[in-house]
């Protein structure tokens, strides 16, 4: 069991590095800073477009049921509850763990998901609500340890 979680941790670190590279590439292309992602729905959509295939590929390579990428930005800082609303993607396997199992979109652009044959689930929402993540603020505080030593296993979290 310990080996299984070690492998998941390594895959999580690799996913984080891959997604960070996608964000860096898109920001450099647009000559933007990360802070400028707020209130930039077209750029956030473009990021999700770039991230969805690598995210789905990584998910299919694992024995876990879902994978997500959360960006510390929102499409609309003026909407009610925006302080807890964050862009990103959450994709989940819809059934048995096979290489061709259909994937479902729980968070992210429905248009991006559909374009990649990842259909929105009935619980789909555009963005994550970070007030539903236990200890979210603590997880978002940069640590001094290397990424491969910074992961933590948490209790199962059910999306509303």
Regions found by a protein language model. Name each.
Residues 1-46, 63-65:
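Juxtamembrane extracytoplasmic/periplasmic/luminal helical "stalk" adjacent to the first N-terminal
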Residues 10, 51, 153:
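Residue-level signal for functionally critical sites in structured catalytic/ligand-binding pockets
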Residues 20, 52-62:
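Short regulatory alpha-helical segment in sensory/regulatory domains of signaling proteins that mediates
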């Amino acid at each position: 069991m310990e080996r299984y979680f070690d492998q998941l941790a390594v895959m999580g670190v690799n996913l984080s590095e891959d997604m960070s590279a996608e964000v860096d590439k898109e920001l450099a292309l647009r000559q933007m800073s990360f802070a400028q992602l707020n209130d930039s729905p077209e750029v956030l959509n473009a990021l999700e477009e770039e991230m969805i295939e690598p995210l789905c590929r990584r998910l299919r390579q694992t024995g876990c049921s879902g994978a997500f990428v959360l960006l510390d930005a929102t499409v609309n800082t003026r909407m009610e509850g925006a302080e807890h609303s964050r862009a990103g993607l959450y994709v989940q396997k819809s059934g048995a763990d096979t290489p061709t199992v259909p994937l479902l979109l729980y968070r992210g652009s429905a248009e991006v998901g559909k374009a990649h044959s990842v259909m929105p689930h009935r619980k789909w929402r555009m963005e994550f609500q970070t007030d539903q993540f236990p200890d979210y603020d603590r997880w978002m505080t940069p640590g001094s340890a290397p990424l491969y030593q910074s992961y933590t296993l948490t209790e199962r979290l059910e999306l509303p």
